[in-house]
Amino acid sequence: MDTNNNIEKEILALVKQKVSPIEYENYFSQLKYNPNASKSDIAFFYAPNMLLCNWITAKHGALLKEILSQNKVGMHLAHSVDVRIEVAPKIQINAQANINYKAIKTSVKDSYTFENFVVGSCNNTVYEIAKKVAQSDTPPYNPVLFYGGTGLGKTHILNAIGNHALEKHKKVVLVTSEDFLTDFLKHLDNKTMDSFKKKYRHCDFFLLDDAQFLQGKPKLEEEFFHTFNELHANSKQIVLISDRSPKNIAGLEDRLKSRFEWGITAKVMPPDLETKLSIVKQKCQLNKITLPEEVMEYIAQHISDNIRQMEGAIIKISVNANLMNAPIDLNLAKTVLEDLQKDHAEGSSLENILLAVAQSLNLKSSEIKVSSRQKNVALARKLVVYFARLYTPNPTLSLAQFLDLKDHSSISKMYSSVKKMLEEEKNPFVLSLREEIKNRLNELNDKKTAFNSSE
């Protein structure tokens, strides 16, 4: 057995006893021991990025030194040991080389439970459905599909179902569609499909994350179709997570869309301010970070609805305060988080605005571009106008043409209608829609930026 690998495991096992489960999983589990650079008086570790290097060094550098100084952990160390954490070097991959398929990930993250899931009006329905599914011996709804924007807690609730099922000694498979594809290709290549089918069709709970990525892969969709049918026929619980509703997953086979809607579908809405503040307080507690009340309120008010971004903001404030040896106050928070508050929705295209509105209201883009008396379509058209006026330089006439409006004076009325609803704050649905559409625009624009930077 690899001695260096054992050393790394011993060190991390000792760290795990000293920090919170979420802190360990999110940060320390990513550390890699570097035996080649380490000496008797200094231990080197690799971390995947500079933020993680700075965070662990500032907040837990002393803890690592203490652990290494007091425990031999398979190394010949001096009494006093220094610790260095560096960014891991990038590994060049030969595109022509044979694919080395990674093992399938079916493990459930034990840090995601129902007990530490923050419940609010935005997600109460999803929470209750998930608990009922996890607690039932036979599927009350099958399948269950939860959908919504990035970072709203969908993966947390999926893992919570898995953890509860494991406590009841059920056989659980939790996998992303990407890993499902990887494992499928590996078994297909090795001609071991019987083993693949046994793995995924002989479980009590089949939990699939990022179900939207099944689309556009005919062989994978075919295999998943048969896996779904067998699980469903044998009354095995199926839970799916997606970033959009089934009918809005473009390119997904109709027969799969139909099956996704056999049971119950529920949307995870963006959190309201009260829920966001509760999330911020919980993340501070789990990460053992103390922030003043006004700083926590500032994060809840000014950082997006993405829970991971809120947690990132908390950590960023703590890291910077440690590095600067400064007290955490509102001024520090405003300075540190300035870049996180920049609105990525600026400069959106009309096409992206249309797509973001369509996904948020479970409509097709083509439906919104045609005038209709249906309330949801009429609201969608008003929202397209509102965001187009906010984020694009398009003149009124071209916007009217985009929405096939003969009277371009209607644009001002549509914009004013939405603006009034938002200012009066009498319609919580429209308020939550605004945040969801902004989040989707940020995602779409970030993808475009990443694509352009890679060209």
From Swiss-Prot:
**GO CC annotations, alphabetized:** cytoplasm; plasma membrane
Record-linked HAMAP family: DnaA_bact (MF_00377)
Please indicate which superkingdom the organism of origin belongs to: Bacteria
Protein name, UniProt field: Chromosomal replication initiator protein DnaA
Outline the subunit composition. Oligomerizes as a right-handed, spiral filament on DNA at oriC.
Q: Which family does it belong to?
A: Belongs to the DnaA family.
- Could you give the domain comment from the record? Domain I is involved in oligomerization and binding regulators, domain II is flexibile and of varying length in different bacteria, domain III forms the AAA+ region, while domain IV binds dsDNA.
Q: Which UniProt keywords apply?
A: ATP-binding, Cytoplasm, DNA replication, DNA-binding, Lipid-binding, Nucleotide-binding
SMART domains reported in the protein's UniProt record: AAA (SM00382), Bac_DnaA_C (SM00760)
User: Region Domain II: which residues?
Assistant: 75-106
Q: Where in the cell is it found?
A: Cytoplasm
Please name the GO terms of the biological process aspect recorded for this protein, alphabetically: DNA replication initiation; regulation of DNA replication
UniProt region (Domain I, interacts with DnaA modulators), positions on chain: 1-75
Q: Where is this region: Domain IV, binds dsDNA?
A: 322-455
Q: Quote the record's binding site residues for ATP.
A: 151, 153-155
Where primarily located? Answer: cytoplasm
Q: Name one GO molecular function term.
A: lipid binding
Species the sequence originates in: Helicobacter pylori (strain G27)
Instruction: Quote the NCBIfam families the UniProt record gives.
Output: DnaA
Summarizing the function annotation, the protein's role is: Plays an essential role in the initiation and regulation of chromosomal replication. ATP-DnaA binds to the origin of replication (oriC) to initiate formation of the DNA replication initiation complex once per cell cycle. Binds the DnaA box (a 9 base pair repeat at the origin) and separates the double-stranded (ds)DNA. Forms a right-handed helical filament on oriC DNA; dsDNA binds to the exterior of the filament while single-stranded (ss)DNA is stabiized in the filament's interior.
Region of interest (Domain III, AAA+ region), residue spans: 107-321
